[in-house]
Amino acid sequence: MNTLSQAIKAYNSNDYELALKLFEKSAETYGRKIVEFQIIKCKEKLSTNSYVSEDKKNSVCDSSLDIATQLLLSNVKKLTLSESEKNSLKNKWKSITGKKSENAEIRKVELVPKDFPKDLVLAPLPDHVNDFTWYKNRKKSLGIKPVNKNIGLSIIIPTFNRSRILDITLACLVNQKTNYPFEVVVADDGSKENLLTIVQKYEQKLDIKYVRQKDYGYQLCAVRNLGLRTAKYDFVSILDCDMAPQQLWVHSYLTELLEDNDIVLIGPRKYVDTHNITAEQFLNDPYLIESLPETATNNNPSITSKGNISLDWRLEHFKKTDNLRLCDSPFRYFSCGNVAFSKEWLNKVGWFDEEFNHWGGEDVEFGYRLFAKGCFFRVIDGGMAYHQEPPGKENETDREAGKSITLKIVKEKVPYIYRKLLPIEDSHIHRIPLVSIYIPAYNCANYIQRCVDSALNQTVVDLEVCICNDGSTDNTLEVINKLYGNNPRVRIMSKPNGGIASASNAAVSFAKGYYIGQLDSDDYLEPDAVELCLKEFLKDKTLACVYTTNRNVNPDGSLIANGYNWPEFSREKLTTAMIAHHFRMFTIRAWHLTDGFNEKIENAVDYDMFLKLSEVGKFKHLNKICYNRVLHGDNTSIKNLDTQKKNHFVVVNQSLNRQRVSNYNYDEFDNLDESRKYIFNKTADYQEEIDILKDIKIVQRKDAKVAISIFYPNRLDGLVKKLNNIIEYNKNVLIIVLHIDKNHLTSDIKKEILEFHNKNQINILLNNDVSYYTNNRLIKTKAHLSNMNKLRQLNLNLEYIIFDNHDSLFIKNDSYNHIKKYDIGMNFSSLTNDWINKINAHSPFKNLIKKYFNDNDLKTINMKGASQGMFIKYTLAHDIATIMKEVITLCQSTDSVPEYNTEDIWFQFALLILEKKTGHVFNKTSTLTYMPWERKLQWTNEQIESAKRGENIPVNKFIINSITL
């Protein structure tokens, strides 16, 4: 291994003294500029005195080690034990870890507190751990935008010989269609062939560099790192020399990366044979690479075949997981022959691990570090590249043999997914543990041994303990070093005092595990605490946090009382009270998706942290008493109650603000310091957000006599496009009433609506009177009735109201001349058996039908039809609404909830009642909406254009459904 590789290995192992010496030595060989950044980082680490040199742990004394550590070292011959000694230790360990956590008392509770506002909607959670769509929307909501200084793509092409194939790949890069700048860095791993000649051939066609290292054998990671250090742009791509990119490859990668620089992009691949084609042919025909037939390969040990061609083995998984969005371990599909990402991630996770000096595994290990630090992975079709198969269909790398070597390294360094829970007899100390228990320690010399020992004496042994001494003024650090300084499962750091939040951030950052457990320095765990939580994580990879409950004990361990236990988790309850008590474990990935512990507050630090975690992933609560909370009078949780209370309400409101909940404040109910009674108060600007046109006078237009009522079910995407579509085809519209979820009413959308109003002089009324927590079978009907009530308050001179759909599209001009021929446009059809069964199960409505029609046979009554595109004379609409309100009141009085879509039947029912009461049969026709049998499919642009021309659309139809606007 060369000096630079040794330096990187030492740095990644936290041996910064050795790393600094080796980087200084590397500077003599490679030049100061190449390693200057690493030298600075080493000096920063050393100056903080926040680590313990690995040299101090070389000498292992078995007498000072916990039992599990002795057994683990013995399993791999690093500690010599006789068989009797080993059996004795096993029996002691089983005795120590044999105690099981007690069940906590469970009581029935409301999952959502009764006083939690119905219209307070918390931000959505991701569908899975790699939900890049959720993350992108979250950053947009928080106003987080990427800051790029040097936009462009640096393409790193590692190569060893294979000049002919490299020639073709460079030719395909010449053919790129993009306005973005890019450079090519050919990184040579000591080739015997003269690659410089190939590179010089393209100096006039590409911005190209050539860097080379001596042939030390298979050093793919080292040569990748060499190329990456040479890169000048903010974004980098790694492209194997045999991967020929399609023409929009650069453009596709950069377009996505500029939108989100916290994502790794992965390109799929196809296998082609180019050995009878020259680079000049590709230069002369940019489409040639994409036109080649797919072929078979013997290169990849994991290849999938279909007939006579080989397929990218990842394609099926890409399809199943929505391009990895729903994948629990996307780094396993991070094949570095064709990827792109922001260069700043190298500063966050480090470089490729140069210990991998055989084929395979290095990309998985690097990808895992990206994943653990909070990076997202996404496959894009625009990243397609064509794998050029060498003559004979095999290359010079012995891949199968290499994989057998590197897989062992992967299992040592990638605990998540690649690690199983094993009995202690079959376990050893891994270089990267599965679990880290972190302990912030300050002046706790009297308690720290019991605390640390409880973490080491867990039934799960794939575990480390990370202790951060936060500038203790007693002998805490001395005790820790004496007891655990030589323990390979304990890592110790020390820093100047900064408070519990600072120590927690330092300790979690110091931890190596994927699953992180929190333990206060004066408390201690039950032996199965980690195992109970870990099993939940392993069952459900979408969990961000698992927590148990605790008991309060005296310093001597005697019971005071069991701790407070809320038996079931809900985000709404956590928003009102800290229910996520010790013992708590979370994933390091989830933690990195937050900004960590808040070092600006002294109390409510944990509450703030777990509110943040609850915003990025699911929680699971276990009703087990796994944690012993020692009360000795100096606990931070029972001191400074006034500050605690203040910060309690501060952190909840900060959580609501992060989730863009702007209509409520979480306020204290009384002035008692020990009280956490609360009240949700509506914010002062709440009505201003909704009634954005309150200061704008209604614009009266002589020929405008139509109102349109629309219900938006959730997001307001495409709202302004919808408004423009309405007025383009309907010149007689006076006002549009939108029932919306105000949580999606952003300042940008409000601005667009105001601009629309000012430009077109069309009145817009926003309404949100109906709670979006209402049963979804009734909500749309209530929303339209509420819209009509808002209109009535304005006393407008209207002739008709149209009930439009948020995702429909007008396609023909002048619906007004059509609808004014009729009183009402509704669809009337017979009820299916499914509808009849649901109505019969809804006794209030069934009784009304019997009352007015004296007929139990619902098949004889035609009153079913989609409400989209329905229109009614304005005066009749209010009569119909009055009847419908009576139906709703009756349902509410009996607390009976319908199981059918009321908007598709209650309008028709009310009209039939009105005709029966008045004895007048109104002039009726069908709705304005055309909904073909394939209505659940989205309309294509071609279908829309065809519909605008009136092709295949009935002459009396003016709206089509459903459109993505």
UniProtKB/Swiss-Prot annotation:
Its main location: membrane. It comes from the Bacteria. GO terms for cellular component: plasma membrane. Keywords: Cell membrane, Glycosyltransferase, Manganese, Membrane, Metal-binding, Multifunctional enzyme, Repeat, Transferase. Residues 419-683 are annotated as: Glucuronosyltransferase. The keyword Membrane applies. It catalyses: 3-O-(beta-D-GlcA-(1->3)-beta-D-GalNAc-(1->4)-beta-D-GlcA-(1->3)-beta-D-Gal-(1->3)-beta-D-Gal-(1->4)-beta-D-Xyl)-L-seryl-[protein] + UDP-N-acetyl-alpha-D-galactosamine = 3-O-(beta-D-GalNAc-(1->4)-beta-D-GlcA-(1->3)-beta-D-GalNAc-(1->4)-beta-D-GlcA-(1->3)-beta-D-Gal-(1->3)-beta-D-Gal-(1->4)-beta-D-Xyl)-L-seryl-[protein] + UDP + H(+); 3-O-{beta-D-GlcA-(1->3)-[beta-D-GalNAc-(1->4)-beta-D-GlcA-(1->3)](n)-beta-D-GalNAc-(1->4)-beta-D-GlcA-(1->3)-beta-D-Gal-(1->3)-beta-D-Gal-(1->4)-beta-D-Xyl}-L-seryl-[protein] + UDP-N-acetyl-alpha-D-galactosamine = 3-O-{[beta-D-GalNAc-(1->4)-beta-D-GlcA-(1->3)](n+1)-beta-D-GalNAc-(1->4)-beta-D-GlcA-(1->3)-beta-D-Gal-(1->3)-beta-D-Gal-(1->4)-beta-D-Xyl}-L-seryl-[protein] + UDP + H(+); 3-O-(beta-D-GalNAc-(1->4)-beta-D-GlcA-(1->3)-beta-D-Gal-(1->3)-beta-D-Gal-(1->4)-beta-D-Xyl)-L-seryl-[protein] + UDP-alpha-D-glucuronate = 3-O-(beta-D-GlcA-(1->3)-beta-D-GalNAc-(1->4)-beta-D-GlcA-(1->3)-beta-D-Gal-(1->3)-beta-D-Gal-(1->4)-beta-D-Xyl)-L-seryl-[protein] + UDP + H(+); 3-O-{[beta-D-GalNAc-(1->4)-beta-D-GlcA-(1->3)](n)-beta-D-GalNAc-(1->4)-beta-D-GlcA-(1->3)-beta-D-Gal-(1->3)-beta-D-Gal-(1->4)-beta-D-Xyl}-L-seryl-[protein] + UDP-alpha-D-glucuronate = 3-O-{beta-D-GlcA-(1->3)-[beta-D-GalNAc-(1->4)-beta-D-GlcA-(1->3)](n)-beta-D-GalNAc-(1->4)-beta-D-GlcA-(1->3)-beta-D-Gal-(1->3)-beta-D-Gal-(1->4)-beta-D-Xyl}-L-seryl-[protein] + UDP + H(+). Mn(2+) 2 binds at residues 522, 632. Residues 132-418 are annotated as: Galactosaminyltransferase. PANTHER family: GLYCOSYLTRANSFERASE, SLR2126 PROTEIN. Belongs to the glycosyltransferase 2 family. CS/HAS subfamily. This is Chondroitin synthase.
